[in-house]
Amino acid sequence: IVLERGPALDERVKAVEHFSATGELDVNANIQFGEGGAGTFSDGKLTTRIGDELCGFVTEVFLQHGAPEEIAWKQKPHVGTDLLRGVITSIRKEIEALGGEVHFNTALTGFEQKNGRLTGIFTTNGTFACEALVFAVGHSARDTFGMLMDGGLQLECKPFSVGFRAEHLQSEIEKSLYHEAAGHPALPRGEYQLSQHVGERCVYTFCMCPGGQVVASASEEGRVVTNGMSFHARNGKNANAAVVVSVGGKDFADDPRRAIAFQRELEAKAYAAGRSAGEYAAPAENIQSFLEGRGQLNIGRVQPTYDRG
C-alpha cells in the first residue's frame, strides 16, 4: 500500500500549471507533492555516487517503463520531466496490476502503537492496520515531521543545503567548455559542477539543469521556493544551477524543529522580498551585484525563466 498526500499525475500537472499561471497554490498538489514527488518536475537525472549494485536494476526498470534507451550507456543519463511523467505513471500501473494499492490525496495524520510496536496509522482518508511503515516523504512534509515528533518519535537533524538558483545563457556555458567546437551536434549540452571551501563550509553547485528553467516550488502558503527543471531535449536558452552551502545539526543545536524554522524563515523572507511583483514572485539580482552586496537587477541578455516573475 502506497499513500500519497497529493493527486495522481494528470490532476497534479493541472494544479502546477494553474499555480504557475495564477499564483493560487494548492498545498497538496504542487511541484513537491503528488505522484512522483519532486522528481517529476526536475531534470530527471539518474546519476548517483553510491555505486550500489541496485543502480543497474533501477535503470532496467526505467527502460521497461519507457525511458529512452540512452540512459543505459550515457555517462550522465537523464530522462527529462516530459518523458519522466510517462515512466512514473507506467510504474504505478504495474504496481496496481500486481495487486498493490496506491491511495492518492491521502496524507498521514497520526499513528498508534502498542507495547512499543506500530499497530496502525491514521490518514485523511481513514485508518489502516499497519505493522511496518516506510517514510519516503521528502524534505517538504514538515507537518509530518512535526506530527511524528509530537507523537514521541525521535528525529535527528540531517545536513541539508540552502542557497539560490543562478541562471545564465546555455551557449556561454558551452563556449567555455567546448571553445570553437561549441554548438557541434555531436556534443552534449554543456554541464558544470563547482565547489569551493570557505572556512569550515563548502559552497557548491547542485542540480545543474542545461537548457532548463527555474520553477516555483512552494508547498506552503506565503513562502517562495525555487527548483530547476529540464525537458529531455534540454533545448532552452538558459542554464541554471543551485548555488548552495551545507548546514547541519550543530547549526541548530541538533533540534529538527529549529532547522525547519530556519527553512521557513528564509522562504518567508523570499516571499516578502518578491511580493511587490506578484504572488510568489521571486527576488532576483545579478550575480556580480550579489557578490558585491549591491542588491541590483539589470535584465540584459539573460531573461529569467522563473514562472511567477
Language-model-derived ranges and their functions:
Residues 1-309:
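Residues forming the flavin
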